[in-house]
UniProtKB/Swiss-Prot annotation:
Catalysed conversion reaction: NAD(+) + (deoxyribonucleotide)n-3'-hydroxyl + 5'-phospho-(deoxyribonucleotide)m = (deoxyribonucleotide)n+m + AMP + beta-nicotinamide D-nucleotide
UniProt keyword annotations, A-Z: DNA damage, DNA repair, DNA replication, Ligase, Magnesium, Manganese, Metal-binding, NAD, Zinc
Catalytic machinery residues: K112 (n6-amp-lysine intermediate)
PANTHER family listed in its UniProt record: CHROMOSOME TRANSMISSION FIDELITY FACTOR 18 (PTHR23389), DNA LIGASE (PTHR23389:SF9)
HAMAP family membership: DNA_ligase_A
Residues that hold Zn(2+) according to the record: C401, C404, C419, C424
Name of the protein in question: DNA ligase
PROSITE patterns (alphabetical): BRCT, DNA_LIGASE_N1, DNA_LIGASE_N2
Domain spans labelled BRCT: 586-668
EC class (word): ligase
Length: 668
C-alpha cells in the first residue's frame, strides 16, 4: 500500500504539472495521450481504493455527481462593477478626476475578457469555494463546476488563505466545437462564447461543465494580507508566481495618452485573439493611490472600463411586436431577419417608442441599420429609405392594449403609450416576474415560463397567490418534477424572511427603486407604519420627491393593495425592516469616522463579523493600509499590512486588545 500511496502522489504531481504547462503556460511538454493515460490510471486507482481520492485530486476535473441546485453565498467583500467609458472624452474626464485627487498616476491597462466574473477562495493553499458575481453581494456557489476548469489550480505552491477574482470564459475554438456538437445533435446553438461560458458554469451536472473546455484569467486579489504587492502590476506578477493564469497582454502606461495608444492597438487587433474581449480595463496601478481614491456605492473611483464602439449591420425589419411592461408602458420591438452583430445572432431589437419610429421613418419591410449599444443591447438606429420596397406604410401604434383591450393613454410629460388598466393580464404577469427577481423577493427557480403557466392555468392571479402554491399545483406544469417542485416551494418559503425593503421593491410601486425602498423601509420599519405615513413625512426624507411620495400614498390607499398585503401577512411574509439602521450607528463611539484595516487570522470571530461591528460603530473598514488608515487590527500571521502599518507609524492592536475594546464599548 505504501507503494500505491507513493504512486498516487506521483500522479498528482505529474498531472498538475502537465495541466499547468498546457492550460496556463500554453507550452505542453507531453502529448495529450500521455496526460490521458496518467489520468485514467489515477481514476482506476481511486475507484478501487476510494480512500486515496481527495478534494484536490486531478480527477475532479472530469466532474462529479449532479447537484439539485446552487447554494447562494454572501461575498466576503462585494464584487463591484466598473463604470464605463465609450470614447476618448469620457476617458480624459476619468483621468482628470483621478489626477485631481491623487496627482500624477501610472495606469495598468488590461484586456476586458467577455465572460463570467467569478471569485475563488483558497484556504491554506487549497481551492475551497468558487462563487459567481450574482448581484455583487450574493453569488451562487459553483465550486464543482469551477474545479473542472484546468487553468484553475486546485492547490497552489504556498499555504495561503485569500480570495482571487477573475473572468471565466470559453475560447473561440471551444465555442466552435461546442456549437458543432449541438447542431449535429439537433439542439439550439449558443449565440456567443459568453453565453456558452455562463450556461456551462450554471450546469447542475459538473460532468457537463467539464466537457465545455472553459478557461479563466485572474485579474485581482481581494485581500492583500499575504501578498507583498504594492501595485496592481505586482499583484498580477505574484499571481503568476503562485501558478494562476493571468492575461499577459497587460501593460503599464505613464499617462492617459498611453492608455489611448493601448486602446487603439487592441481595437484594431481584438479579432486576432483566441478569445472574445469587449473592451479595455484601466486601473490606477498603485494600491495606496487606489485606496486614497476610494469607491462610490457601485464602483471603484480608481478604475474604468472602456467599451469598444458598437458594430453596425444592415438587416430587414420583418415586423413590429408590442410588449406591455409591469407599469403598463407599451414598448415596440423590431422583429428582424437574423443577423450576426458583435459575435451574437440578433433577431430582435429595441425601437423605444412611437415618436422615435416616426422620427426615423421606420417601416415594416425596410432595410434597417442595427447596432449593439455597449455590445449588449441591440437597437435600430435608422432605416434606409433608398432600399425601401414599394407599398410600405408608415407605422402607427394601436389605440387599445393588445393584452386587455383597454384604451391606451399618453400621460402628461411622457412619450410612451400606457395601459392604465390595473387588471391587465400582461401587467400582472410582468409584475409577478418583477416580484420574484433577485433584488426583490429573490425566489430562485421561479422564472417567466413557470409564472406564465401558473397564470394561464388560473392557479395564480397575483403575487400573493405564490405563497399559497402546493406541490399539486406545480407538478402538472411542463418539465416540473418532484425535486424541482420541492426546491421551488423551499425558495418561496425562504423568501418570507426577506427584510421589508425587498417586499417594497418587489411590489413594483411606480417610481420606487431599490435605493428608495431601502431608505423608506429603514425610516418607517414596518408595513403597518407605512400604511399610516403621510406625504409630508415622505417628503422630509432626502432624495424622496413629489412623484414618488404621491405614487406611494396612492398605492397604499388602494383597497386591492390593502387586501394583497393582508393576503401576504396571512402566510407570514415578513413586513419589518431587518437591516442595520443608520440611526443605530454609534456616532459617539471612539471608532466613529475612523478608517480601520483588519489583517491576519482572527480566532474569536470572522473578519466579516468584525467589520460589521466596526461599521455599526461608525468606522470604515478598508482592505489596504495607507497614510489615511487610523487603526490596524492584526490577527495571527499578519503579513505585509502589519509591516506597512509599523513603517507608517499607524496604531496597531492585537485581536485580544480589540475584543477588550469591544467589551468596554458595549458596557458603556
Amino acid at each position: 500500500m505504501a507503494e500505491l500511496a507513493t504512486r498516487v502522489q506521483e500522479l498528482h504531481h505529474l498531472l498538475n504539472k502537465y495541466s499547468h504547462e498546457y492550460y496556463v503556460q500554453d507550452n505542453p511538454s507531453v502529448p495529450d495521450s500521455e496526460y490521458d493515460k496518467l489520468l485514467r490510471e489515477l481514476i482506476d486507482i481511486e475507484n478501487a481504493h476510494p480512500e486515496y481520492k481527495t478534494e484536490d485530486s486531478p480527477t475532479v476535473r472530469v466532474g462529479g455527481e449532479a447537484q439539485a441546485t446552487f447554494n447562494k453565498v454572501r461575498h466576503d467583500t462585494p464584487m463591484l462593477s466598473l463604470g464605463n467609458a465609450f470614447n476618448e472624452e469620457e476617458l480624459r474626464r476619468f483621468d482628470a478626476r483621478v489626477r485631481e485627487k491623487a496627482g500624477k498616476v501610472e495606469y495598468m491597462c488590461e484586456l476586458k475578457i467577455d465572460g463570467l466574473a467569478v471569485s475563488l477562495k483558497y484556504e491554506n493553499g487549497r481551492f475551497v469555494q468558487g462563487l459567481t458575481r450574482g448581484d455583487g453581494t450574493i453569488g451562487e456557489d459553483i465550486t464543482a463546476n469551477l474545479r473542472t476548469i484546468r487553468a484553475i489550480p486546485l492547490r497552489i505552491n504556498k499555504p495561503l488563505t485569500f480570495e482571487v477574482r477573475g473572468e471565466a470564459y470559453m475560447p473561440k475554438k471551444s465555442f466552435e466545437h461546442l456549437n458543432q456538437q449541438k447542431e449535429e445533435a439537433g439542439e439550439q446553438a449558443f449565440a456567443n462564447p459568453r453565453n456558452a461560458a455562463a450556461g456551462s458554469l450554471r450546469q447542475l451536472d459538473s460532468k457537463l461543465a467539464a466537457k465545455r473546455r472553459l478557461s479563466i484569467f485572474l485579474y485581482s486579489v481581494n485581500d492583500f494580507t499575504n501578498f507583498h504587492a504594492e501595485s496592481q502590476s505586482e499583484a498580477l506578477d505574484e499571481l503568476d508566481e503562485l501558478g494562476f493564469k493571468t492575461n499577459q497582454n497587460r501593460k503599464r502606461v505613464s499617462d492617459i495618452d498611453g492608455v489611448l495608444e493601448y486602446i487603439k492597438y487592441w481595437t484594431a487587433h481584438r479579432e486576432e485573439l483566441p478569445y472574445d474581449i469587449d473592451g479595455i480595463v484601466i486601473k490606477v496601478n498603485d494600491l495606496e493611490e487606489q485606496e486614497e481614491l476610494g469607491y462610490t456605492q457601485k464602483s471603484p473611483r480608481w478604475a474604468i472600463a472602456y467599451k469598444f464602439p458598437a458594430e453596425e449591420v444592415v438587416t430587414k425589419l420583418l415586423d413590429i411586436e408590442l410588449s406591455i411592461g409591469r407599469t403598463g408602458v407599451v414598448t415596440p420591438t423590431a422583429v428582424l431577419e437574423p443577423v450576426r452583430v458583435a459575435g451574437t445572432t440578433v433577431s430582435r431589437a429595441s425601437l423605444h417608442n412611437e415618436d422615435l419610429i416616426h422620427e426615423k421613418d421606420i417601416r415594416i419591410g425596410d432595410s434597417v441599420v442595427i447596432k449593439k449599444a455597449g455590445d449588449i443591447i441591440p437597437e435600430v438606429i435608422r432605416s434606409l429609405p433608398d432600399r425601401r420596397p414599394e407599398g410600405t406604410e408608415p407605422y402607427h401604434m394601436p389605440t387599445h392594449c393588445p393584452s386587455c383591450g383597454h384604451e391606451l393613454v399618453r400621460l402628461d410629460g411622457e412619450v410612451a403609450l400606457r395601459c392604465i388598466n390595473p387588471k391587465c393580464p400582461a401587467q400582472l404577469v410582468e409584475g409577478m416576474i418583477h416580484f420574484v427577481s433577485r433584488q426583490a423577493m429573490n425566489i430562485d427557480g421561479l422564472g417567466t415560463k413557470i409564472i406564465m403557466q401558473l397564470y394561464e392555468n388560473e392557479i395564480i392571479k397575483d403575487v400573493g397567490d405564490l405563497y399559497y402554491l402546493t406541490k399539486d399545483d406545480l407538478l402538472p406544469l411542463e418539465r416540473m418534477g418532484e425535486k424541482k417542485a420541492d426546491n421551488l416551494l423551499n425558495a418561496i418559503e425562504a423568501s418570507k424572511k426577506n427584510s421589508l425593503e425587498h417586499l417594497l421593491f418587489g411590489l413594483g410601486i411606480r417610481h420606487l427603486g431599490v435605493k428608495a425602498s431601502q431608505v423608506i423601509a429603514e425610516r418607517f420599519e414596518t408595513m403597518d407604519r407605512l400604511f399610516k405615513v403621510t406625504e409630508e413625512e415622505l417628503l422630509e426624507i432626502h432624495d424622496i420627491g413629489d412623484k414618488l411620495a404621491t405614487s406611494l400614498i396612492t398605492y397604499l390607499n388602494n383597497k386591492d393593495i390593502i387586501a394583497l398585503i393582508e393576503k401576504l401577512r396571512r402566510k407570514n411574509v415578513n413586513m419589518t425592516y431587518e437591516g442595520i439602521k443608520t440611526s443605530e450607528i454609534q456616532t459617539d463611539s471612539e471608532f466613529n469616522g475612523k478608517t480601520v484595516v483588519l489583517t491576519g487570522k482572527l480566532h474569536n470571530m470572522t473578519r466579516t463579523e468584525a467589520s460589521k461591528w466596526l461599521e455599526a460603530q461608525g468606522a470604515k473598514t478598508t482592505s489596504s493600509v495607507t497614510k489615511n488608515t487610523d487603526l490596524v487590527i492584526a490577527g495571527e500571521d499578519a503579513g505585509s499590512k502589519l509591516t506597512k502599518a509599523e513603517k507608517l507609524g499607524t496604531e496597531v492592536w492585537s485581536e485580544d486588545e480589540f475584543i477588550q475594546k469591544q467589551k468596554e464599548v458595549e458596557n458603556k
